[in-house]
Swiss-Prot record:
This is Small ribosomal subunit protein uS2. InterPro entries: Ribosomal_uS2 (IPR001865), Ribosomal_uS2_bac/mit/plastid (IPR005706), Ribosomal_uS2_CS (IPR018130), Ribosomal_uS2_flav_dom_sf (IPR023591). One of its GO terms (cellular component) is cytosolic small ribosomal subunit. It comes from Listeria innocua serovar 6a (strain ATCC BAA-680 / CLIP 11262). Belongs to the universal ribosomal protein uS2 family. GO terms for molecular function: structural constituent of ribosome.
Amino acid sequence: MPVISMKQLLEAGVHFGHQTRRWNPKMKKYIFTERNGIYIIDLQKTVKKVDEAFNFMREVASDNGTILFVGTKKQAQESVRDEAIRSGQYFVNHRWLGGTLTNFETIQKRIQHLKKIEKMEADGTFEVLPKKEVVLLKKEQEKLERFLGGIKDMKGLPDALFIVDPRKERIAVAEARKLHIPIIGIVDTNCDPDEIDYVIPANDDAIRAVKLLTAKMADAIIEVNQGEELTEAEVAPVEEKAAEETTEA
């Protein structure tokens, strides 16, 4: 049974593509028809592709891999942040800083600087510094948190990227491809699907559509993690019983 239904996709407006004059011919195989100058995405193919992406997400999570959610357009910012946090992963939902992946060491230095400022605020250093200096530090903290807050606890390069609108996030796509990091992407009719390993043909402009698909990818990770928790919960009583029996013997 598919992980997402046609009804859910229709209700969220996933089938609405871009205007016919704004399209990438490589997306032709994912287009069902054209209506009033707008391409309509073939949702049967979307259902299948969501399944493939979902299963890949599960694989990554099963190997304790990390996934970086990326979506800096307004329609994606909230979903990307919320679903990454819900699934215990990482996110970039404002500007993608060039070198986030390809120059990870430098980015890590900026993150360390952010953590240093946070520590200064927490341990009371701000209270003994001149007001002007504190204002500047807070401004810097705010800026760094905005761009790097979603990855400040990411210890190394991610094992996969989930991207909303690869056309907008072309720098992130280029960096991931250079480092051979697999990409799952919500790909609209104006995007190049060849750059994405797991294409989800869908409307990337409607908030509901983005939310539905991003949440579904997060669900894949959560399912795996909850499964592990259940297994541990089931194993614990068995181990306790075995220990008791050994003691009695």
